[in-house]
Amino acid sequence: ALPIFRMAQSPDPEARIYTRFVDAPEDANGKLQSIAFKNEQSFNFAFDIVDALGREKPEKLAMLHVALDGTERRFTFKDMKDASSQAANYFTSLGIRRGDRVMLVLKRHYQFWFAILGLHKIGAIAIPATNQLVEHDFSYRFQAAGVSAVLCTADGDTAHHVDIAEADTGMKLT
């Protein structure tokens, strides 16, 4: 059997940000009894969770990224809030708008998180994809999903495959 790890929780349920959006009563042993979502129509993970933590607990560690060479990068919730806002502004400057479908092909780069949160902030739809796709895979996905923009890694041949697929489909991607 796999070990079970319990997260240390604040004794005050109101101190937990997620309680603004989720009703998740637990029994005396901490077992989830049910789950119900609140404010579904206006919920935005980037604003309502990440940015809230960036304001309320700015120095709290949000992400630890360890690169293949062992380089560690630490990002606080304030870092995530600020970087995702910069990404959102950049995407908006490119013409990406609410409802646009944007494919993210970023391998395991930490920038994926800034990008996906930035897209959430502007209401765009993020479509994560593996960097193992080739031209025909991209062509199919571009057409099937109505992709309007692609953010991809410069590693390997990914950008080349995206360019060929864009030309093959006749689509003009941002």
Say what each PLM segment does:
Residues 49-76:
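AMP-dependent adenylate-forming
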Residues 70-75, 89-136:
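Conserved AMP-binding/adenylate-forming
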Residues 1:
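Extracellular interaction modules
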Residues 66-68, 79-90:
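Conserved N-terminal alpha-helix of the aminotransferase class I/II PLP-enzyme fold
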Residues 50-54, 80, 84, 102, ...:
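Adenylate-forming
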Residues 4-46:
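Flexible, non-catalytic linker and terminal segments flanking ANL/adenylate-forming cores
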Residues 5-14, 93-94, 117, 121-174:
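Structural core segment of the AMP-binding/adenylate-forming
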